[in-house]
Amino acid sequence: MQEQKLVKGQQISLSLVSWGRLGEAMGQWEETDVFVTGGIPGEKVVAEVVRVHRRYAAASVIEVLEASEWRVEPPCPYYGVCSGCQWQHVDYRRQLTVKQEKVADALHRVGDFIEPPVLPVRPSPIQYGYRNHARFTINRDGDLGFVNRQTRQFVRIDRCMLMHEGINGPLAELQGKCAETSQLSIRSGQETRDTLVQPTLINPEISLASGQKFYGDSIDGHAFRVSSPSFFQVNVEQTVQVVQVIREALEVKKTDVLLDAYTGVGTFAVLMAPYVGKVIAVEESSAAVADARLNTGEIPNIELVLGKTEDVLPNLTEKPDAAILDPPRAGCHPRTIESLIDLSPPKIAYVSCDAETLGRDLNLLCESAYTLEQVVPLDMFPQTHHVECVALLTRKSPAAPIILASASPRRRELLTGLGLVFQVVPSDIPEEPQPGEPPSKMAERLSLEKAQAVAARFQHGFVIAADSVV
């Protein structure tokens, strides 16, 4: 019997069994994996095929035949059409547990951790209206909106429920008036309501100011200037909790030197500076460093270094007591990992928005130098499948060396046969008997004296001076 082929527009019934990597629910139809937006594992649905690939298909729920207990009514009128959110139809409590499972799965699958120590996800203080940045596509009519990830169709958006009012206000004013450009970015401080609109708009119908080079925002009472090309956390309220997790993990002291790699506009450097002796903040973006110089200007214990992290770390002359890594989604350059292992800070807090690249980098760090103590996921992006993580690593204690203070051929052969690595350190103890000393007592005394003499040269290790003296 010839296998049936799916076609775009076809409606199919299927049972959903698991979550996909991008937040869809997955089922099978005639041995073809189908990734279904708007579904929940455990449900039976009717879905319409929107794209067909060689090995899988994408579909969208049009009818729920058997609903999950976790299904809720999405509040957004654009939900399911715009694709910016994936999980508005999923109870928020379930969103958090699924994100924990996804992080653990990625660390196991990519990082090769058997039972990764992933803690429960810390919820966001607000589940809607948290974003301070939006990038809109604009159609020929000047309408602002988003492009559906699967169908590639443009969807006009008059109000986004993930954005706070500092975004939605300008969106309403600009809607239908921006045909002069194809992309438009709006950024706005959640507390300051300071706004940046890029690019510059010349339509005389638009009264809203545009073309600003930067805007101001604040986190936990600290003001930050953010230039148009610079990265800044999109969920300011949850960022406060991220910093709290980092502080708890690193347990820094007022005398510590803290490395803040990929510092951006200096967010973590500014928020951690009061708790350490010095922060070395590294960033490759010249625009972000210019922002960071203003943001850290009155904080004397922050040293800013412009350059790629993988180029700066090998040349650091000061060894950090702790380190924060907050790389882009692609993760750390291999040379960054190598240099960090050489610098050997006792504790590292690795902040990541991609669990798979996090797993890859943690695997490299933990191969020989570090132990993964815990991973704290934080919900920086409610209603989506994305999740932020803070991983805590502690430096492994160096293996205690085996030192031979007396290396007979038999002793060498025995240790080598056991696969043990050792070094021979001869002592200067003269092998002379004391008056009236029996040979057995002489051997015992010399072994102890040799062991004590050699042990005085080392801070730690196992010193062997006889077959029975360690």
Residue ranges: model-predicted function:
Residues M1-L325, A330-E338, S344:
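Accessory RNA-recognition modules of RNA-modification enzymes
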Residues V257-L259, A349, I403:
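Conserved beta-strand elements of the Class I
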